């Protein structure tokens, strides 16, 4: 079976990250993106260097791209400019933002100095550039992951900025199309982490009601956090945790033409780990849709996954999205440590087109292409064997607070075979012997419910609001309490030698609403 990296979507393009920065459909139907030429070693290159922004156009829906055309040269050759993101507003103006770094010594990762660089053009063609250092928020910034234009026409741009020990989040906004900018209060998140990437990092925002915005924040606390603004981004509430698991990675929000909100994020926990509580489980990207202003979501399905040949520590991360049509969106993300050889110095970017309708589905059957495993996968199922210290296979299904799963399993059950139900992706790295006891388990515990079948056969797993029941060949053998409100992943694993064949899979959600914990 051919491995598919992108699920429920059509891959349009792949290119170097610096050659394809987000994607948007122009009013004439063509696709537009930006590319950048920066310093060869980024923020660590102290020598003067010319740095440029170029535009690119696709006439064939992203399959091929025309030669880049010049848009702008950044003003200071000593500063390092990293293109962060851009937006074309309703009047056609192009707004471009960059991270302008003036000092980032190798020997002091917490000495980060710089500011936000901004340039506005009359259109994507680059007329009449207007440059600003955004004096209202003159601090070093990290990544930019979305930009919105509110119903009233205000531009709101979420940033996290460095405050000496970690990051705080906030927004800048403009009511005059980018001529001038103001900044909100800072939103902070406290943790015991000592990494410079802790705090309230890389926020994204969405307008959930006229003038009411919700901010989602990357943290090291195994959850996305959120804050609310009731004045279109001028001020923000204190941050609180959501119910959505997340490794230390940013999310993305996009309001669809019908008013629903699309959420994309790394719904993963655990290894690879760094520092005290720093999960980099970015192997898979997930998507969900909300019809009630992010109070609840549906779906929580994998849309980008780890494939055979990728490193276990692969990053499929940093999603950004824009509307392509009434029914489809453009989704961009980058990859690090993939089988193509991508790395932090050679990020691989991808642009796909996706119809979010599948996120409203409530059941899946025999979705073998969506399973993640080193074992053999065919159109008839999974042949699960111990490969590289563990037999491990995991798949994703529509989130269910109440639901059921049926599996047809054949073979002699290896000793210690387990079924894990979770509301997050759990990579095989979490279960190999050297990682089973470590900082991750000490900090977060076991983010799953473990079931123990006593034989191969017809496995039936049912759960309601409080408990889970496991039956084998019609006989109930285990009942236990849920440790999370619902599930959207199932893992089958064992450590001993042996072989199991999974020949049928059927998951059904009876209560598909995932309460995010967001309140306003």
Regions found by a protein language model. Name each.
Residues 354-401:
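Low-complexity, Ser/Thr/Pro/Gly-rich disordered linker/stalk regions
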Residues 480-506:
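Flexible glycan-contacting loops in extracellular carbohydrate-active proteins
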Residues 1-363, 374-375, 493:
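Asp-box/BNR beta-propeller blade signature and adjacent active/binding-site loops
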Residues 440-458:
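Short, aromatic/His-centered strand-loop micro-motif at the edge of beta-sheets
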Residues 73, 84, 240, 392-398, ...:
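Beta-strand-rich interaction surfaces with strong enrichment in secreted/lumenal proteins
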Residues 385-442:
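Secretory/extracellular carbohydrate-interaction modules
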Residues 507-520:
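Extended recognition patches within non-cytosolic domains
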Residues 407-409, 455-472:
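Short tryptophan-centered beta-strand motifs in secreted/extracellular beta-sheet-rich domains
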